[in-house]
Amino acid sequence: MKQLTILGSTGSIGNSTLSVVRANPELFKVTALVAGRNVREMAQQCLEFSPRYAAMSDEHSAKSLRLLLAEQGSDTEVYSGETAACELAALDDVDQVMAAIVGIAGLPSTLAAIRAGKQVLLANKESLITCGKLFMDEVKRSRAQLLPIDSEHNAIFQSLPERIQRQLGYSSLNENGVSRIILTGSGGPFRETPLSQFSDVTPDQACAHPNWSMGRKISVDSATMMNKGLEYIEARWLFNASAEQIEVVLHPQSVIHSMVRYHDGSILAQMGTPDMRTPIAHAMAYPMRVSSGVAPLDFCKVGALTFTTPDYQRYPCLKLAIDACNAGQAATTALNAANEISVMAFLDSKIRFTDIEVINRTVVEGLLLSEPTSVEEVLVIDRKARDVAAQVIAKLNN
């Protein structure tokens, strides 16, 4: 039985992970749960899965959780803060760590799991977007095992030779017969919306994804296709791919989750019903296969599968992310930070949908930054970019 720590247990990925545990209780045991401030949901999770430990992001939330659990007779030990999250990610008797805390906030605990040599189920793409080489160097040094959770990266992983799977981030695609990775994306809810209407898009409209059920931040990223841009950056690091070895294709049906093209002309693709429980179950049980609880794909109901080239006028954030990736780690760190701030401002109705790209581009182009050589330097770039993004937002509101 695999012992599991879930970082970000009350989020979308965390809940899907617990759904897989629920479907396979003989295979997985939850040892620790880590979340932000959603006390009531964390209490429900603790009562159902009886973890030994739980941690909240702040002491006030932790105190509230202790009171709720004490009323129910739970003996789960409750802690708070980033240090606690890192300690629970590195517990000696934990086999797997689901790294699903959204944003740069998830970096310290994800790195703690890596440094402890755990099998890390990586849903926190920001770890690679901001720390790329530094992160992969830690993986190599600690001999941790990375298993990608994003549906696209998991699809690519499944379609690659086992030799690459076992040496993720360091094997040569070319030497293993791979010519190109094809990263697919639906295009989000505004794929056919007239560009003239983009400035009037509301947060609720942006969060109404046609195929996937996701959190609000990632839903907005999907609408701008920044999510695909961030996935592009992540894929470059995860699969040791050059710019010439990866392309992005729009696939509105979200049935083919990504593809790998080989030298002999073959293309391997992973297909399935769009449900995050599928890649989560694959990574949790790897190299075995277990029930995910997802309904099987019905090809007759799906009908046609279509593909188009992304339009950068419609999706300028995608182009911005690809350009940042080619510029280096400082640019991708700044972009990620600016995007977190701008999306938050949009969700709070402080800026327009079209302002997201403007803010992101202004931050990336306006900061003159050296390439980071440590995680501490990455965090400095992150803070600077957030400050500049906040200043740009303030100017837009004046």
Curated annotation (Swiss-Prot):
EC main class here is oxidoreductase
Positions annotated to bind Mn(2+)? D150, E152, E231
Q: GO terms for biological process? A: isopentenyl diphosphate biosynthetic process, methylerythritol 4-phosphate pathway involved in terpenoid biosynthetic process
The Gene Ontology terms for molecular function here are: 1-deoxy-D-xylulose-5-phosphate reductoisomerase activity; manganese ion binding; NADPH binding
EC no.? Answer: 1.1.1.267
Q: Which reaction does it catalyse?
A: 2-C-methyl-D-erythritol 4-phosphate + NADP(+) = 1-deoxy-D-xylulose 5-phosphate + NADPH + H(+)
Organism domain of life: Bacteria
Instruction: Indicate whether Ion transport appears among the record's keywords.
Output: no
The alphabetical list of record keywords is: Isoprene biosynthesis, Manganese, Metal-binding, NADP, Oxidoreductase
Please tell me where 1-deoxy-D-xylulose 5-phosphate binds in this chain.
K125, S151, E152, S186, H209, S222, N227, K228, E231
Task: Please give the cofactor(s) recorded in the UniProt entry for this protein.
Answer: Mg(2+); Mn(2+)
Q: Pathway it belongs to?
A: Isoprenoid biosynthesis; isopentenyl diphosphate biosynthesis via DXP pathway; isopentenyl diphosphate from 1-deoxy-D-xylulose 5-phosphate: step 1/6
Q: Where is the signal peptide?
A: none
Q: Which residues bind NADPH?
A: T10, G11, S12, I13, G36, R37, N38, N124, E126, G215
Which Pfam families does this chain map to?
Answer: DXP_redisom_C, DXP_reductoisom, DXPR_C
Q: What InterPro entries would the database entry show?
A: DXP_reductoisomerase, DXP_reductoisomerase_C, DXP_reductoisomerase_N, DXPR_C, DXPR_C_sf, NAD(P)-bd_dom_sf
Ribonucleoprotein as UniProt keyword: no
Q: How does it assemble?
A: Homodimer.
Described by its record, this protein's role is as follows: Catalyzes the NADPH-dependent rearrangement and reduction of 1-deoxy-D-xylulose-5-phosphate (DXP) to 2-C-methyl-D-erythritol 4-phosphate (MEP).
Q: Which family does it belong to?
A: Belongs to the DXR family.
Q: What is this protein called?
A: 1-deoxy-D-xylulose 5-phosphate reductoisomerase
Q: Which organism is it from?
A: Yersinia pestis
